[in-house]
């Protein structure tokens, strides 16, 4: 058995490098002058735990103290839930200057909540996504996002499965990390 983005004991797992993904997003926000960075993450899974670790680790390395209120639990691919979390963040006395969403689709909920509040992206608040789906390239303003390399995830999983079938006695269960890349857009303002 080969799994993608799920870890099971004694099973081959091909994983998107979620720690590196959040590090890239936080560093991009920081390089653009943001110090009040919020993160709406997905429900608690191994993927989420890695993303949270990447977020907190990078913030600590950069000397950023992130208030607990800036880290919110949303639901992956649920734009409405992420819109509600965005409204909460916007209601804070000292709101964040940048919000990282759990995925690009959920960021649409953030776009809507920000517009409903009479604010503009990126003039009033910056927004980042995760996944790098086609939608992130066509939404206005174009979303800054971390693109997972889904082609390499699939190819690596297929290669490992073939290896397991052809050489079952010498194939060891391992975890293989596949890195993605930061896609620039126009949703983050330099402050």
Where are these regions (language model features)?
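Bacterial carbohydrate/catabolite-sensing allosteric modules
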Residues: 1-191
């Amino acid at each position: 058995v080969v799994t993608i983005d799920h870890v099971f004991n004694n099973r081959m797992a091909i994983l998107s490098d979620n720690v590196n993904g959040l590090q890239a997003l936080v560093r991009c926000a920081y390089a653009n002058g943001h110090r009040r960075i919020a993160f709406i993450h997905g429900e608690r899974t191994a993927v989420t735990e890695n993303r949270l670790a990447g977020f907190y680790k990078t913030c600590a390395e950069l000397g950023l103290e992130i208030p607990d209120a800036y880290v919110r639990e949303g639901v992956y691919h649920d734009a409405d839930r992420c819109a509600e979390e965005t409204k909460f963040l916007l209601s804070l006395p000292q709101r964040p200057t940048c919000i990282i969403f759990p995925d690009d689709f959920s960021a649409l909920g953030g776009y809507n909540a920000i517009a409903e509040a009479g604010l503009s992206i990126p003039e009033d608040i910056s927004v980042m996504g995760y996944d790098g789906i086609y939608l992130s390239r066509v939404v206005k303003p174009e979303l800054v996002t971390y693109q997972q390399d889904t082609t390499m995830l699939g190819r690596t999983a297929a290669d490992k499965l073939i290896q397991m079938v052809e050489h079952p006695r010498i194939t060891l269960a391992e975890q293989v990390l596949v890195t993605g890349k930061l896609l620039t857009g126009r949703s983050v303002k330099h402050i």
